[in-house]
Amino acid sequence: MIYDYGYDVIVVGGGHAGVEAASASARIGAKTLLLTHNIDTIGQMSCNPAIGGIGKGHLVKEIDAMGGVMAKAIDMAGIQFRILNSRKGPAVRATRAQADRLLYKKAINSLINNQENLDIFQDSVDDLVVENNTVCGAITKTGITFRAKKVVLTVGTFLGGKIHIGKVSNAGGRAGDQPSNALAARLRSLPFRVDRLKTGTPPRIDRRSVDFSVMEVQHGDNPTPYFSFFSKGKIEHPRQIPCYITYTNNETHKIITDNLDKSAMYSGLIEGIGPRYCPSIEDKVVRFADKERHQIFVEPEGLNSIELYPNGLSTSLPFEVQCNYIRSIKGFEKAFIMRPGYAIEYDFFDPRDLKPTLETKHIKNLYFAGQINGTTGYEEAGAQGLVASINAAISIDSDKSWYPTRADSYIGVLIDDLITKGTKEPYRMFTSRAEYRLILREDNADLRLSDKACELGLLSKEDQQHFISKKNAIIENIAMMKNTWIGPQTQKARDLEKFLDKKMTRESTLFDLLKRPEIDYSKLQQISELNLNLQDDAVIEQIEISAKYSGYIERQNKDIEKTATLEQKAIPTDFNYSQVKGLSNEVLQKLTEQKPTTLGEASRIPGITPAAISLLTIYMKKTGFIK
């Protein structure tokens, strides 16, 4: 049966990538259908009950700056908020929030269900409608065909998903859910490169069986931060509660090493490669055999939940072994496991087969986002869902496209890494992956991206006005401070002396004074004659960072300008690299396979040398492809 409701975009999957994708295309005005195997699991946190962290928090802020739902949802559902690296520079500070799982899912559903242009239908997708190498719709398990101009696949770990607990394996997309084997087989029949990856989750513990008195207490920040740029004064956080910290020990490690042959990872049952930066407890004990203990974050799953998430104990060991090593840990001596930990392996498709828009190179109008591209994490998934669906929506009746770059966002870094380098293990974001960290901060994500969000129609009128007011306040106040001078012999200078390490010897602007490490905006406000009445902390923060890091920021902007030339030089999709004399066979093969869209993208493909880029540039200039 064909249901032709005139959909512009179909999003397959209701996880974190799917939610951002469905929301984005609908906000732009595209008639959107979200297809999910179970409406009740939309927005579900399948693994850890937390959002953000180093690198990841930057992604959440950027999604929010583009009008996404993740930051607002966690503001409604977060039960502990912390700023990580708060004593370090602004480039590496990151927000992390512990979530109440039920409140988070409720918040996501509230935001999605009230979104115009968005329909939701419950059924698994088994097949795609593909005509002349162009996707035209999706076919569900019950035989219903939904036609659309664009399809975005955000299927998580469900493609050929297999769950392992010890040597017991069964098919599953996650615990309690069936995998999407029919869709996996269909995708394998298309000209995409496919491989397997693995991830895992720890056992869940009944909090009533845990002795918290012997653990370290970890409180959230006070005042409680907000994730969304648009939440303060509108959203009230739930009650805030602490997390706890405990540690493994030598006994824990012995139990694990004595039973490694029973682990699905170490017995050879799992083919997929696991995440390097979120390893199982088995991997930690083997790879870091010299460490006497490993830190475990004991995280509540919700205000009214009795389940605890022991972050750091992901495992594929048998249930009996899980019980034994859990009870060897301080505070867990009488722990009762409510759900066993498990590993899951699944299909992913080589992201080098994608364009920067996340449209596939082989099938037109088909987009991939999330774990299907080899990433791990809610935040990475949400970022991809956003970009894929933006491009699906804006290209319906035109050849428009938009994608972030390494110079303007961590989302740009994420996508560029994936499409140029690919991945052999689950990819997660870190601040160290970005070249321009000082520019790509959490605090200025809106200043970097919200203008584009306004242009694309992604922000509500209210959020748009909030952003414009903030941006104008920053511009106006910086201009005022750059044009307000204080002479060394004035009363203002004498009033400032109590704050200065060295007396003023020449006339300075307020902006230059703010560059001094001992001066901040609040101290300048104490000089009554200056009439600095600004009270908006977010605006003040931007003014201070602009002043104190101005030299570094200018340097990074110059670096960006140098590389921008290559980024602007487009390579036609049908470009014949064999015509370029002097390219090695290796370079020729890689360029032909990956089909980079710009010279900048080509330059970042592993194995492509500066000499090869030079030859390519000269040829393209001679033949008129670039000026």
Curated annotation (Swiss-Prot):
UniProt binding sites for NAD(+): 274-288
Gene (UniProt): mnmG
Higher taxonomy: Bacteria, Pseudomonadati, Pseudomonadota, Gammaproteobacteria, Thiotrichales
Pfam (any one): GIDA
Keywords: Cytoplasm, FAD, Flavoprotein, NAD, tRNA processing
Organism from which the protein derives: Francisella tularensis subsp. tularensis (strain WY96-3418)
Cell compartments where the protein resides: Cytoplasm
Any Gene Ontology biological process: tRNA wobble uridine modification
Protein family according to the UniProt entry: Belongs to the MnmG family.
UniProt xrefs under InterPro entries: FAD/NAD-bd_sf (IPR036188), GIDA_C_N (IPR049312), MnmG (IPR004416), MnmG-rel (IPR002218), MnmG-rel_CS (IPR020595), MnmG_C (IPR026904), MnmG_C_subdom (IPR047001), MnmG_C_subdom_sf (IPR044920)
Keyword tRNA processing: yes
Name of this chain's protein: tRNA uridine 5-carboxymethylaminomethyl modification enzyme MnmG
